[in-house]
Design a protein with these regions (language model features):
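Surface-exposed flexible segments
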Residues: 79-80, 120, 188-191
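C-terminal segment of classical bacterial N-terminal signal peptides
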Residues: 4-12
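Generic structural detector for well-ordered beta-strands
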Residues: 62-64, 129, 157
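Hydrophobic ligand-binding cavity/cleft-lining segments
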Residues: 15-105, 111-118, 208
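Glycine-rich portal/gate segments that line the openings of hydrophobic small-molecule binding cavities
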Residues: 56, 91-153, 160, 173-175
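Glycine-rich loops and low-complexity Gly/Arg-rich segments
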Residues: 86-90, 99, 121, 130-134, ...
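Terminal "cap-and-tail" regions of soluble proteins that handle hydrophobic small molecules
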Residues: 15-42, 46-47, 52, 143-145, ...
Length: 208
């Protein structure tokens, strides 16, 4: 859980204390998930945990990037680079950024998998800001822009692992309407019962 600075302390001390606590929690999570991450295949071993609470979907994704921490944070600190990453997903149609005094205004346009003009897609408006950036810990957030409470919050943190590797943690939440929860539960109870992500599990497979 990412912490904010506590009241009653000097601003610099508050930020440093919160960053130290968050880094310690990220390191503890990594040690717990390391066996799963190290078993992963591909260029970026990945572990995803999801849960639901009061109709809200909560997700945590952890990945090991085979790139030095300095290069990773250099890329992530600039919101414009997010517009090179996020549209790689098939549902993302476009991404724009505009500088603001409180951070960078970032707009994502999401729609159906097939071709769809950005003007027909749904816009999610965010303010992107970096909370912490030092040699051992990085944290940033995408928060709903003023007047757009429907944009789900996203928090990102990273830390170096050594050996030119970087641990990335993305936390997100999403509140869905009742009709969509019923439809989703019905799908995963029937047609999607053997699916994890995009993969179909074999009958004898174990979920790790």
């Amino acid at each position: 859980m990412l912490l904010l600075a506590a009241p009653g302390m000097p601003p610099g001390t508050q930020a440093a204390t919160a960053a130290e606590t968050n880094r310690a929690e990220l390191l503890a999570a990594y040690r717990l998930l390391e066996p799963r991450l190290r078993l992963g295949t591909g260029d970026a071993p990945l572990a995803v945990e999801t849960s639901t609470h009061d109709g809200q979907l909560l997700g945590n994704a952890y990945a090991i990037l085979h790139h030095p921490y300095g290069k990773v944070t250099e890329a992530l600190r600039d919101a414009r680079n997010w517009c090179d990453i996020l549209p790689l997903h098939m549902n993302m149609k476009a991404c724009t950024t505009r500088p603001r005094q409180t951070g960078t205004h970032l707009t994502l346009y999401a729609g159906r998998k097939s071709y769809q003009a950005p003007g027909q897609a749904r816009a999610f408006n965010y303010t992107y800001s970096v909370q912490t950036l030092d040699s051992t810990y990085f944290s940033a957030s995408l928060t709903a822009a003023k007047g757009d409470a429907d944009s789900p919050p996203v928090a990102l943190e990273a830390m170096p692992l050594g050996g030119k590797q970087t641990l990335i943690h993305v936390r997100y939440s999403w509140r869905t309407p009742l009709w969509l929860r019923v439809a989703t539960d019905s799908y995963f109870a029937t047609l999607g019962a053997r699916k994890v992500g995009f993969d179909e599990l074999l009958a004898t497979a174990d979920i790790v």
